[in-house]
């Protein structure tokens, strides 16, 4: 069994030095959201010599200029605002050799109604530019998430399904931009005969991207670095259910492998799949791991006084600037690398677990050891000098 299905942490990194160019490309990928937490993993894994469906030529799309931490990936980087239909048409419609689309981006608005409008428009812009112009387009992967079962952030879990969460559960009776995206996908693929799709629903993602709006590991690293700098205890900013209860997560590399599997395996076509690591953990154990990684005193759950990172970190911008200067870190602003709102949601609620049975029944046997995953992504945040 190759590393591809073995769930090996860091296997992709070990392969990079072995690959040789040039190659004749079998498949051509378009990653939309290439600087995001999963897009970055796709950009690392797709070009490898033994990636199924390959050799792959890869285009990567993101709104901002290419960051230094993404530059080593052997892809063609395209700066494009997918919310702007004119920009999309000009920059993406010429990519007529694309065979597979990996859509892994989103934008955050103040209400779910606005989320539906903006995120629906983004996906539709991309598909309108690609489907009519790519004669060999075979498959579209759409990444959504577990809020499919739990509801939008503004009414999270108010009317959610009882876990374990399975792919055949009906949609909730509420607005959800994931539903909007799915409906657009289902409608657009009908316009090209033989074009297939897959939907991927991860839980909380462990991965690396300083540009991600939902980067839990990076955010916790920044919090721990500030505690280290100030000699403070690493207080747990969450609820008892998160501290004592079972949680799970989705490794970004695993999600990338899951999407590539669905893109090339006939048995995975036209299906929606959960994607998580396949094990469970408790935050009270991972909190000790985080404290050890940064050499800080580990706090405990504080009965009756749940703290929030948004409150603890609201005045820490100057502190972070000092940490960056003193340690020669990559230049970042606290508001960019600290997704406090998202961390407060994850740690402020008990975890609603899913099941990977459907993926396994369809042939995907990938998994991750979540503790090893957590540590490996912490190491990557340090390696790219985001934290000391």
Swiss-Prot record:
EC number in record: 1.3.1.122
Xref: CDD domains: 5beta-POR_like_SDR_a
UniProt KW keywords: NAD, NADP, Oxidoreductase
Domain of life: Eukaryota
Reaction it catalyzes: (S)-8-oxocitronellyl enol + NADP(+) = (6E)-8-oxogeranial + NADPH + H(+); (S)-8-oxocitronellyl enol + NAD(+) = (6E)-8-oxogeranial + NADH + H(+)
Family: Belongs to the short-chain dehydrogenases/reductases (SDR) family.
PANTHER family, sorted: 3-OXO-DELTA(4,5)-STEROID 5-BETA-REDUCTASE
Protein's name according to its UniProt entry: (S)-8-oxocitronellyl enol synthase ISY1
Native species: Nepeta cataria (Catnip)
Gene: ISY1
């Amino acid at each position: 069994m190759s590393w591809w299905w073995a769930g090996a942490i860091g296997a992709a990194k070990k392969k990079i030095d072995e690959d040789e160019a040039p190659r004749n490309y079998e498949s051509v990928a378009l990653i939309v959201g290439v600087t995001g937490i999963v897009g970055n993993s796709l950009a690392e894994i797709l070009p490898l010599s033994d990636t199924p469906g390959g050799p792959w030529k890869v285009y990567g799309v993101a709104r901002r200029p290419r960051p230094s931490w993404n530059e080593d990936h052997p892809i063609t980087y395209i700066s494009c605002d997918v919310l702007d239909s004119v920009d999309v048409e000009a920059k993406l419609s010429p990519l007529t050799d694309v065979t597979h689309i990996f859509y892994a981006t989103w934008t955050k608005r103040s209400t779910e109604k606005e989320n539906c409008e903006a995120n629906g428009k983004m996906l539709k812009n991309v598909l309108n530019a690609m489907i009519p112009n790519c004669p060999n387009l075979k498959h579209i992967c759409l990444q959504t998430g577990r809020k499919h079962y739990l509801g939008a952030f503004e009414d999270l879990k108010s009317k959610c399904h009882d876990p374990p969460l399975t792919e055949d559960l009906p949609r909730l009776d509420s607005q959800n931009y994931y539903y909007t995206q799915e409906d657009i996908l289902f409608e657009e693929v009908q316009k090209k005969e033989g074009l297939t799709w897959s939907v991927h629903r991860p839980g909380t993602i462990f991965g690396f991207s300083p540009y991600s709006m939902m980067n839990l590991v990076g955010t916790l690293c920044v919090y721990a670095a500030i505690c280290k700098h100030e000699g403070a205890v690493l207080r747990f900013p969450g609820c008892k259910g998160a501290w004592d209860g079972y949680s799970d997560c989705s490794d970004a590399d695993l999600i990338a492998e899951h999407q590539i599997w669905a893109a090339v395996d006939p048995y995975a076509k036209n299906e929606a799949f959960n994607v998580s690591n396949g094990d469970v953990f408790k935050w009270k154990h991972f909190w000790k791991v985080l404290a050890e990684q940064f050499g800080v005193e580990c706090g405990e759950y504080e009965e009756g006084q749940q703290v929030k990172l948004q409150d603890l970190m609201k005045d820490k911008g100057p502190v972070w600037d000092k940490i960056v200067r003193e340690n020669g870190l990559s230049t970042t602003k606290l508001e960019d690398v600290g997704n406090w709102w998202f961390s407060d949601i994850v740690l402020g609620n008990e975890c609603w677990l899913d099941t990977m049975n459907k993926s396994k029944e369809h042939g995907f046997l990938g998994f991750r050891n979540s503790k090893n995953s957590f540590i490996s992504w912490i190491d990557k945040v340090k390696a790219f000098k985001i934290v000391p």
